C-alpha cells in the first residue's frame, strides 16, 4: 500500500499498465521492469507491503517533503522478482532530467544534510 495522491509512470512501457501499479503479479517470463513515481499530500510519506505466507508487513515512513522522489520499482520476472520501494531526493532519471524538472538539489561546500527513514517489520 502506497497512500500517494499522484502516480506517474516512468516511461511508455510503465504507462501501458499503470492501472495495476499497486498489484504484485505472478512471475512472468520476459517481464520488463516498470517504475512508478509517487507524490504524497504532505510530509507523511509511507509505503507498506504484506507477505501473506509469513503474515508479515514491511512498513517504511519518511518526510515526503524532504525525500520527494519516491519510486516504486517492479521487476516481476521469473528469475528476477523484485519490488523496490525507494524514497530519495530525486528520481533515477539522471542529473540532466532532474535539472530540467527542477528536482536537482545541491549542497554548498561544507554543507551536510540528514534524512530519516523509519523501517518497521510487523509480525
Question: Predicted regions span which residues?
Answer:
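Active-site pocket scaffolds in enzymes
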Residues: 48-123
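Active-site/ligand-binding surface loops and adjacent short beta/alpha elements
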Residues: 1-59
Amino acid at each position: 500500500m502506497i497512500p500517494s495522491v499522484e502516480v506517474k509512470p516512468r516511461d511508455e512501457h510503465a504507462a501501458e499498465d499503470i492501472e495495476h501499479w499497486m498489484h504484485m503479479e505472478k512471475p512472468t517470463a520476459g517481464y520488463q521492469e516498470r517504475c512508478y513515481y509517487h507524490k504524497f499530500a504532505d510530509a507523511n510519506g509511507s509505503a507498506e507491503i504484506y507477505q501473506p505466507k509469513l503474515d508479515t508487513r514491511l512498513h517504511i515512513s519518511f518526510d515526503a517533503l524532504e525525500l520527494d522522489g519516491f519510486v516504486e520499482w517492479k521487476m516481476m520476472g521469473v528469475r528476477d522478482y523484485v519490488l523496490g520501494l525507494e524514497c530519495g531526493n530525486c528520481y533515477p532519471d539522471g542529473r540532466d532530467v532532474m535539472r530540467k524538472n527542477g528536482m536537482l538539489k545541491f549542497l554548498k561546500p561544507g554543507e551536510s544534510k540528514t534524512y530519516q527513514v523509519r523501517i518497521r517489520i510487523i509480525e
